[in-house]
């Protein structure tokens, strides 16, 4: 609301509203103290103030922006003040003005007129009028006219209203309610209907609280026709009961002019006590029940007179009835200081009175000082007149037809009468407003802008269009007054001086801010003259931008929220921020006529109830501990359901006012912001959809049906419960799958809570779980790190601290008081449903993880860094060497070759192009954007993945570790580099990129779950955190005995020890067992808790793990398949039934357990709860014991082992009494001779609708193994076979050996005769020949593959699976399933006939072309169906047929992460329809390998599925042949096998390769050695060359080979060098040194070359090297000792040197002549020999400058040593250079003369 100036000052947002004068809580800017940079205040953050105080503007601002009225030099305000009010300061910084410590800018703690400091009018200790701390007698506060409990300017601020003498509220029974309709100005055809009684003319003068109080006083407290309104007690408006103190009313003390007995407000409240100038006990008169400064609405008689008014007559004016206070009173007595009144008192400043008496500043008949008018009014306040008289004259600020006060008349702060005149500030045709604002539609602009309809001083709420523009901007509709306006939803049309405010206000948003604060909420940022107001503005008297409660007149008073004032202290003081009472609408619960006539609600029945329940909901406190149950009590007790649920459904508009908006109402609990009307019936209730299972009147119920999965009437047979959605029968439980889908959808981890309170709320995603703890948790908010219990579905929510306040009740913002209470989940102590907070995901169930898996992935990194790469030029970026991308705690990708980064955005590299996840690395996840191989990053690379431990973590050792490493080595398309068991780093190389890694399901098969031999016997169960399942920990139990596992089990005589076969379902995820929704993916790398039975001593002494493994393998391979059971009991028909030994107990008990135990259903992660419920209901249960025994004995139980949906078969009827299935039968088998049943028929149970998910199985446990028993030839050509799937040796009667029975031998002889006569063995022969026929099939397939290159395999395979196809068709019922069985047997025509019979003509047409046309269109169609969520409408057989049409014979992919009704499960075609491996391979052979069947492609496709555990590994000779054929592509460069076989065959002497056999062998050796050399294996190649038969060729080849690799031979001193390997191969050492000499020569190391040649015994080459290079170099270097030493080496072998005397001997004689015969003066024999050698050597230099220089040097040295004898020798002189020779000749001539 605005006090004046129409639009609320300068730079107003016009978005403020809330009813009430001075108690609103605006959040927008005002002209006087906004948080934006407006004209009079800068952008202070937290200490907003008003015009005369505070940090935001006005007079005495300490802000950063000096406004015109708030600069520091102007009024002496220091910069450190936080709020400075006009009449008092609240800070401690010094700095006084002319008015003492108060005034305009003082920052002392004293008040201006009697504060603590030395001021103009008083000091701190001695006040002017004797009061304790204030000049005017205030005891506690620093108010000017009477202190309150707060140090404000004018007293208390108990949210007083600004109302004047408007009379008492009449109640709501006077005028019937009718909606107020107003037409839009811009669109006359559109009307606005206000469904609020306060908009009616008869009630608009009063607030809802006043009307309600009047109804209460008149006795209307219930739903009677004359009842009162239904608003309850709230803080709506400025008349609440807040405890703030401020302005003009004191809480405790008496002021100068009167004592305030009971918290009077500043501007006229409805309290019973007086204010500063009208209360009793003061200097100027005591009035116990008078009003405030500007007039009150009290009607009590005055008690005594004061200085300016007495009880009988006033000093300055008389009155007939009573006294008037100084500034006006409601009493009809005496006059006040400035005027007299006979009928009622007038205010002190009669600016608008029109009484008959003559006030001080006005006449009795002509109106107020600023306007004339006829007067019949009895008096008015300072700011308003209560009369409704006609005003005929024009005032200074506008024409007023009826007596308007200075600030408006009529209602206290706004005139509502017609006006015809114009004013200085604009024309006001209707209802002149107050001093600064008009309330009518303006047709012309005034000085300060046009003022529109109905804007009173304190704000009106009309919605009209402004047409004119003013100096400060035109406001289109409902500009506010001084205290703010509440114009609704009108756009601004013009811009003013201080900013264009043409931004549309939000609906029901305040439009303006007032002088005393902006009263808006959630304003938008709008520009002003001095800047954009980025935060909400403060008013002149303080900003109160709280979001819910309205504030007081001079301060902020919020309810349970922190004060959010923008500019600190206000002019009249800041509020104490005391907590208000909670908003509870506690009145008029059943009154439907609160808003008018009952016709409005006539169509609704009466909603009166006997016990409405509590009207207030406590915000804190612990809930009462209740007895725990899975469902609420009213759901468990159908008899009480109607009493608890079916409350009277009689509500106006479908909801109850008593509960609406409270925390317990459905609308509040579903909203994230209670009290913000987020779920109101008028606005945003559409944000939350109503589910089908909840009736349309769910808002009327007192119990919330959303707390449970089931409907309230699910278990009730009462017919009335059908209205609530109940099934109406105890026997029929209807589960609505569409109810609350968010309860069962997987949690969204990426979901972030909404921070913006005004943003649209999404659908609430509550989750339910069962609280299993009766222990009260401590009241503290901590991070939940307690692991969830293993056997409960309880998901403990995060009790994290409410940093942003979103952990309140039901997701509401938590208040400071509520924050101390325990979290909501911890308050619930019963077994009722616990609601997890809406904005949070439930914490995952914590389990102990192996070391390393707890490390979270870190940040990405690259080398070189991104900055270094960006600094490169384009050419450099095209070849970045050593580029590596990594991620902390995950791994790295190092590219082996230079990569081209010129076309790669480095910002998209991390997480988009290169994705590094734990145990996985992906480059180019989008295949469409992947460049060709060798381009971009799709190049060879080295990948290192951390934490690649086995499932058990780094502690796994032994065979499991070895298998893990083998698994790593077998990853396709990768080259294993290394694996570090300690760190878990797995390094491997790839040639191109896709997704590489180790999935959690890729670690082990079930035979990997072994434990190391335990050294000690444990008597207690191992903890569930163990990652492995003990082989000897699971004891077979009787499935009928539920508590069998609690008993101590002992080993039975003759039986195996309790070591259960570890299947994958035993180590399934624990969360799947419980049926709960785990927030983590089901394949997370977490240890799988084992379900172990208690161990005792009898379990410790069992089989060793290797024996156990062998036993399991034999057990699985000896099992029987249901479709190829070639060994029924007829096989042993000639013999007596074998005895049932105790040793086979374990296998049989496991079979019975498989069928008889409660079925363990696993649903993949993310599936809905209904599948678990349906699976548990429809899953197979206990069977007839006779049937179980029959199946067990016949071996048919193995048909259903690890099957998802076993095919139906005929039911067997076998007499009870044979075999065993319980412990009783087991005992009989141990001590009695039990017989097996004779020839039982093969039976299986019928298929149920529940499909088991695919589970990992051992490669040895396959259908082929189950189908064919292991048969082998024994001694004496006897056929040995295991019988009845038993791996152990059967007890055999010595007198009757079944292996040598005549029948068996007769069948063998018959088969031999057939084969020898070359007759075709029919595969459809009797069972006794089937296993023999398989051997014949192997030979036939081998001939087709290797003789005919695979031609004819298709027809052969169709004939091979023909019998299995016929048998499966007889067991299949559905036509679509029969079509798939036919397709598996390549019977396309028959499949089309089945589809035509089913009426699916289009699909039959497509099937007729299967395998013959391109299937890309079908693949595209399937993709579209999957993306559009249509696959849910298809049955699984239809989906499988379409997948086959698309060329996919493996897995039908499902659809996840969609609503439940659109989810589709994945399944493997072969497992879903019970296909064996041969028919599954046939699907790939006929339909996926192309138009012409490609056997090799089909084999590779099937092998890939086997490696990915989609298909079992066949144990068949047929599959071995197929793999050999598919991998027969020969690499002609690889001659290893040919060389080895050739050598091996030739050395036997039994095979000859012809006359040139040796040449052929040598050629193979040379070829193989060349291949090895090309592969850098030159050392093994040397060994191959040594195998050459011809010695000369062998020597030449080896020496040549060594010469080419001489640089790799190494030093003989290094034992690890190839030097010693070559010696071990038998390579002569001379050949090795010769090769090394070549290496030294290439490096120009002549001395080492010389030595190597010496050791290679190549003396001639050594001599040549020494004479040409080594000797001359040593002579020139003057290294005579080494020269002599090297020459001695040749001297020792001079017999091998024919030219010794003329070559190397020179270098031996020269050092001897120089060192031994110096200065002798004569030449001896050796000297002459040396000279001859030099002459001979000189003739061989051939111009070599090195040799010539050495020879000249030796000749000159010899002349120097021998003197004249040598100098006179012409042989030496001719060896010298010409200049040197001339020197010696001249010397001889001179000596001669």
UniProtKB/Swiss-Prot annotation:
Region Nucleoporin RNA-binding motif (NRM), annotated ranges: 859-992
Main enzyme class: hydrolase
TM stretches of this protein: none
GO cellular component entries: nuclear membrane; nuclear pore cytoplasmic filaments
UniProt biased composition (Gly residues): 467-483
GO molecular function annotation: hydrolase activity; nuclear localization sequence binding; RNA binding; structural constituent of nuclear pore
Peptidase S59 domain sequence ranges: 857-993
Biased composition (Acidic residues): 999-1013
Biased composition (Low complexity): 437-459, 518-535, 814-823, 1025-1037
Region (Disordered): 404-583, 740-859, 999-1043, 1066-1097
EC number(s) stated in the UniProt entry for this protein: 3.4.21.-
Biased composition annotated in UniProt, kind: Polar residues: 417-431, 500-511, 546-575, 801-813
GO biological process: mRNA transport; post-transcriptional tethering of RNA polymerase II gene DNA at nuclear periphery; protein import into nucleus; RNA export from nucleus; telomere tethering at nuclear periphery
Gene3D superfamilies linked to this entry: 1.10.10.2360, 1.25.40.690, Peptidase S59, nucleoporin (3.30.1610.10)
Quaternary state and interactors: Component of the nuclear pore complex (NPC). NPC constitutes the exclusive means of nucleocytoplasmic transport. NPCs allow the passive diffusion of ions and small molecules and the active, nuclear transport receptor-mediated bidirectional transport of macromolecules such as proteins, RNAs, ribonucleoparticles (RNPs), and ribosomal subunits across the nuclear envelope. Due to its 8-fold rotational symmetry, all subunits are present with 8 copies or multiples thereof.
Assigned protein family: Belongs to the nucleoporin GLFG family.
Name of the protein in question: Nucleoporin NUP145
Annotated source species: Chaetomium thermophilum (strain DSM 1495 / CBS 144.50 / IMI 039719) (Thermochaetoides thermophila)
Gene expressing this chain: NUP145
